[in-house]
Amino acid sequence: LNARLRADGRTLPILAAIVVVFGIIAAGNPTFAQAGTYAAIFAIAAIGLSLLLGNVNQISIGQAGFFGIGAYAVAGLTTAWNLPAWLSWPLATAIGVLIATLVGLGLGFIALRFRGHYLAMATLAFGLICVGIFHESKALGGAIGIEDIPYPQFGVLTISGYPAYWFAWALALIAALLTLNVLRGRSGRAFEAIRNDELAAEVLGVPTRRYKIFAFAYSGALAGLGGAMYAAFLGIVVPDAVSVQLSISLLLMVVLGGSGGVSGALIGAALIGFLDISGHQFENSREVVYGLLVIGVVIAAPGGAFGVIRSRFKAQPLPARTTPANAAPRAIAMPVADVAPLAVAHVTKRFGGLVAVNDVSFTLARGTLTSLIGPNGAGKTTLFNAISGVGRLTEGSVQIAGSDVTGWQPHRVAALGVGRTFQNARLFGEMTVLENVVAGAFRIERSSFAADLLALPSSRA
């Protein structure tokens, strides 16, 4: 994670410089300017998908649905409202992004029930449902779609043609910076822990379900923003433009560029944009060309184009400490004296007809070390699972510092100060030693997703 973020931070200014140089070159070439504009639009949507796929390990083949929500919101509202051009587009865009975010929250909640290819199929179904709604809704123009969408306007400046290139890439780079803020903060560490080992993350205090939903909502918001810009700059939206093929194209951008960061999404979108410029030479075999390209990348560079760059940024050793650490220990809030730290009462766990734990009761005294001893198969791990929230109880209750935690999720139990290890070590294999240690402090950090997004001081605590 550290090497990935460092590579992202150093690559992003280089990509910004390339955008500027290409923009200067495209000043006299409308085809280049238009291709660059749409590359920026798709890059915004790809950034969200890259976070979802590469950092949270949640695949989505329905991003075109969010893209379409943003596009149709802008198309429908700007053509229906009798508002000044400088006001209608920002307001319609905000509404479209908000709707896409809320739909992302809902899809994220539903997606908690699915994993692997089942999740891919569920998100694919979402995308197909959205296309069906767009196609059949008379209010949205049906199969014809909505046309005559006004260009964004700020004062006397109309954002179309060549100015649209700079506007689109400005928003794309802002989206990249905001996403990089998230990945550098507490939320980014939570995402990475979930990707490496979801159960280990949960027992360390990471609310994995909540962060998965956050990831879906954020990716939906960025896709909605991309769709809003697409509608405004193209001037027309039809259902076929936001079909499953677009979802696959966005996934292709992430695979080619490299998932798990922002630079890879920008690179992937630029590569596809370049191919589209020269695509007239293989218009009838585009899918074949894209397929061969993906196969080549998977074989030669599994991490995508950015993975090759990232491989040069290995984790660096920590600098030697130049000032002595404060020897004073941090004050620890102790529970109320007359409340037992842990009380287990009549805990029973059955697996069908097999009784793994039978009517176990004990109370731990403060300041003592207690051992649970038994042969293999005696139910020790099952009891630990019951106490830590990993496994559901059949009967009985567990109290921690006077609070009944029976049936609680593991991250809520961890928030009360109960930690656990596993019989087999569960390390976050793609994180450094320091990052593994820092992950254990997640429950005592106080930053939020919004604070990480805006890089507020609490996100650096």
Where are the model-predicted features located?
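Helix-to-loop junction immediately C-terminal to a conserved catalytic motif
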Residues: 388
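Conserved ABC transporter NBD signature motif
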Residues: 396-404, 416
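Transmembrane alpha-helices and adjacent helix-loop boundaries
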Residues: 1-325
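Conserved Walker
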Residues: 381-382
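ABC-family P-loop ATPase nucleotide-binding domains
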Residues: 431-461
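The feature captures the beta-strand-to-loop junction immediately N-terminal to the Walker
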Residues: 373-375
